[in-house]
A protein has these predicted regions:
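Conserved donor NDP-sugar-binding/catalytic core segment of glycosyltransferases
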Residues: 100-129
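Short aromatic/hydrophobic "clamp" motif used to bind/position activated sugar donors
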Residues: 89
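Cell-envelope/extracellular polymer assembly enzymes that use nucleotide-activated donors
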Residues: 2-5, 43, 176
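Short, well-formed alpha-helical segments that are part of the catalytic scaffolds
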Residues: 12-33
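Acidic donor-binding loop at a coil-to-helix junction in glycosyltransferase catalytic cores
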Residues: 171-177
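Glycine-rich, basic loop-to-helix element that forms the pyrophosphate-binding segment
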Residues: 68-84
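A conserved acidic beta->alpha catalytic loop
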Residues: 48-56, 96-97
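Hydrophobic helical membrane-anchoring modules
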Residues: 1, 179-239
Length: 239
């Protein structure tokens, strides 16, 4: 049984973070101090790219460690991982919403000799027809390509280190990591969903948001620099 360090990059998203931390602290067996002994959540590390006092206060309310950092998701994840003490690592975005018992699902995968895995992508919203089309398409993309960081990537600490860790980039920071993990062993999809906030799809439009995301992924695959892609992302979408 593993102890998990949860690492959460955040940037001006205190409302969503409050909900997520509340869910994490309400999981079966989780202590308010984050010390569980042989299994469960050992610690929660929030890496704040905005260096915001509000974020720090939210972390204090839920006994999460607050770490300021430059606003670059890859750098934030690296900073959080450098402080993590758990035998396993679980990376969550601040706007993620959890299934009932994610720790048990991850434990089962690791006990079956997986090096890590990811949760099924599902929008946290009433079932609109665009979501019903996009969710299976995303599942297929994950199997033939790379699951992204909003799907709750988890892995053993050793596998993370052996795979090379996150890239220090603002976008696509998990791509090399996931590919490295798959070379090491089984990186498995879980049946359990992680619920994704659809607010950005609502603001930008379902198909416009999807089109921009796919174009960025194609540009990255062709060798475009992540820093330049991040600038393009911010110019075309509502962050």
């Amino acid at each position: 049984m593993s102890s998990f360090s949860v690492v959460i990059p955040c940037y001006h998203d205190e409302a969503s973070l409050t909900t997520l931390l509340g869910q994490l602290r309400s999981l079966p067996g989780t202590s308010s101090q984050g010390v569980l002994g042989v299994q469960g959540i050992l610690e929660i590390i929030v890496v704040d790219g905005a260096d915001d006092q509000k974020c720090r206060e939210v972390c204090g309310q839920y006994d999460a460690r607050w770490v300021p950092c430059e606003p670059c998701r890859g750098q934030q994840l690296l900073a959080g991982t450098a402080l993590a003490r758990g035998e396993a690592l679980w990376f969550l975005h601040a706007d993620a919403r959890l299934p009932p018992d994610p720790i048990l699902a991850m434990e089962r995968a690791l006990e079956q000799n997986a090096v890590g895995g990811y949760f099924r992508f599902r929008f946290d919203a009433p079932r609109a027809w665009p979501a019903l089309l996009l969710e299976p398409a995303i599942a297929l993309r994950c199997r033939v390509g790379v699951p992204y960081g909003d799907q709750g990537l988890f892995m053993t600490r050793r596998a993370y280190m052996d795979a090379g860790g996150h890239s220090p980039w603002p976008l696509f920071e998990e791509v090399a990591l996931v590919r490295g993990l798959r070379r090491l062993g089984r990186f498995v999809p879980l049946h359990e969903p992680l619920f994704i906030d659809p607010r950005r799809w609502h603001r930008d439009g379902w198909w416009r948001r999807t089109w921009v995301n796919r174009n960025l992924a194609l540009a990255f695959a062709r060798g475009a620099k992540p820093d330049r892609l991040a600038d393009r992302y911010r110019s075309k979408t509502t962050i």
